[in-house]
Amino acid sequence: MRKHYNNILKKFFWLKLIKSRTKLHLTQAQMSRKLIMEERSYIELDHGNACCSALTLALFLIYCCEDPMQFLAELKVEFEK
């Protein structure tokens, strides 16, 4: 059951990450610095090959997400489908 939610989060976060990076006009390297992570690790997120850690999610919500409450509301909807 937990793996199911992890897969939902992975896909949801990936879509939001790409949208945010595009909107902020940042390169992968710039986004990795904003999220305080190695560029190689960021690229794995950017390609949808990895799921975010709790720290990465928190940094994204604080520094990159236009509306964190909307993000969480939309994620809740995905979890409840």
Which residue ranges define each predicted feature?
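A short, Lys/Arg-rich alpha-helix, primarily the initiator
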Residues: 1-23
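Short, charged recognition helix plus adjacent turn
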Residues: 2, 7, 69-81
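Helix-turn-helix DNA-binding elements, focusing on the entry/boundary residues of the two helices
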Residues: 17, 28, 39, 54-57
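Residues in the recognition helix of alpha-helical DNA-binding motifs
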Residues: 20, 34, 45, 74
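The alpha-helix within a helix-turn-helix
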Residues: 21, 32, 61
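Short alpha-helical DNA-recognition segment
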Residues: 25-44
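DNA major-groove recognition helix of helix-turn-helix/homeodomain DNA-binding modules
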Residues: 53-71
